[in-house]
Amino acid sequence: MLELLYATGMRVSEMLHLQIFDVNLQFGYVVCNENGKERIIPIGIPCKKAMERYLQTARTVFVKDEKETALFTNCSGKAMSRQGFWKVLKGYADDAGIKRDIAPHTLRHSFAVHMLQNGADIRSVQEMLGHSDISTTQVYPVSYTHLRAHETSA
């Protein structure tokens, strides 16, 4: 889940609404349907491999009802809730020794900043994030510029 969030910049709600048929590992993309809008988000090899492992191992352990199409499920094999995801995230943070509060949106923010750092154009990032207004996406270059200024002054 964390790999998918970071690799795509999806919102947690978008990820939790994914169905198995929304993921195409052969061609490396995820179809995100949120608020009546559909967007196709590419995923790279690390994310594809993580998704393959999840689908072949963890999901098959939890899901007993073959009619269940939710991509991410809880231990009972039902679609995972936001609260359930929050517990998973908190557990990973604790395991990693992270003491500060961690928010799922941090992964979305990191995705956008890292895409821009590595040469993606802002319009492409806007489309992948699903922002209808470019001004929402323009916050990320400001964050990136602020980070670079902080790095060079240190």
Language-model features, listed with the residues they occupy:
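C-terminal catalytic core of tyrosine-transesterase DNA break-rejoin enzymes
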Residues: 3, 7, 91, 108-132, ...
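Short functional hotspots where side chains directly engage DNA or cofactors
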Residues: 28-33, 103, 114, 126-144
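Conserved tyrosine-mediated DNA breakage-rejoining catalytic core shared by Y-recombinases
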Residues: 13, 17-53, 67
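Conserved small/polar residues in nucleotide/adenosyl-binding loops
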Residues: 145-152
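Major-groove DNA-contacting interfaces characterized by cationic-aromatic clusters
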Residues: 48-87
